[in-house]
Amino acid sequence: MKILMVTGYKPMELNIFKEDDSRIQFIKASIEKRVREFLEEGLEWVIISGQMGVELWAADVVMELKEEYPVQLGVFPPFENQDGRWPDALKEKYEELTMTADFFKPIYKGDYQGPYQFRTKDMWLIDKSDACLLLMDEEFPGSTKYFYDTLQKTAKDYPVFTITPQDIDDVVEDLRMQDPHYWD
């Protein structure tokens, strides 16, 4: 696998409303754990659409991993000005990402036109990647359901690796056990 797509929940679906929410560090650690494994096996690119939440957090992880691995980050939003209605803090983060990513190109020119742009974006990212890392709870799929349904219908031999709530709990426990005060 050379190209991995990463996607998952938007922050609101996880009841995360601030960038300093402590749960983000656990999600990032879970993403890092999986991406690091793929990098050890030869992963070269991580691609995302740049939506807020899991995808922006994955971008942060990839940018940090660039210090250790020759990984590249591609950002392919469904349309220009994807961040038009986002909170200012997330807009700034997204703008910075568009400048620091190794490759950035919206799939459609112009602003939002209709839901077909999201479906096209999903299919394009699936077509351009070798596998997907998806943060999703099958009991509460939220907006990831649309992407997951697309995968089920169209990408039969496409590997999907998931990060589940249990995976995040395991990472939380690992991080707690690394804290020297945990053992006091």
Swiss-Prot record:
Gene3D superfamilies: 3.40.50.450. Belongs to the UPF0398 family. It comes from the Bacteria. It comes from Oceanobacillus iheyensis (strain DSM 14371 / CIP 107618 / JCM 11309 / KCTC 3954 / HTE831). The lineage of its organism: Bacteria, Bacillati, Bacillota, Bacilli, Bacillales. It holds the Pfam family YpsA. Signal peptide: none annotated. This is UPF0398 protein OB1025. HAMAP family: UPF0398 (MF_01575). PANTHER family: UPF0398 PROTEIN SPR0331, UPF0398 PROTEIN YPSA. NCBIfam families: PRK13660.1.
